[in-house]
Amino acid sequence: MVEWKGDILAVGVTEKDMAKDDNSKFQNSILKKLDAQLGGLLSEASSEEDFTGKPGQSTVIRLPGVGTKRVGLIGLGQSASSAGDFRSLGESVAAAAKAAQASNVAVVLASSDGLSDESKLTAASAVASGTYFMSFLILKLTYAV
């Protein structure tokens, strides 16, 4: 994933995804692989910032010298199953992109367990909708000020 070339790789995570083993390594396979590619920066940052995957939580790490410039963890809460959960993810991604002045953003889920193919399409649509809405709102507020 780190090979992707862009401004922010945003990873939607649940509280369950953030569980770690006795060695402070992620139990989630996606986060474990990403953390290994980043030399442990993800687990270190999540511990330092007390990031647990709660709704509304986010942390963005700058990555010099790799494909993507930043990796962001966006909290989804206990589980992400409703369109509203994924719309909130999109809104958080748009806010992080605005703060980082990013123009190229990729969004992935740390786990999609329990999501049917149809649910994955609904989730993708909701993320896009939330991102678009928040981007529009940010632009509107910027020009209103």
Language model features: what each stretch is:
Residues M1-V145:
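Glycine-/small-residue-enriched capping loops at alpha/beta junctions
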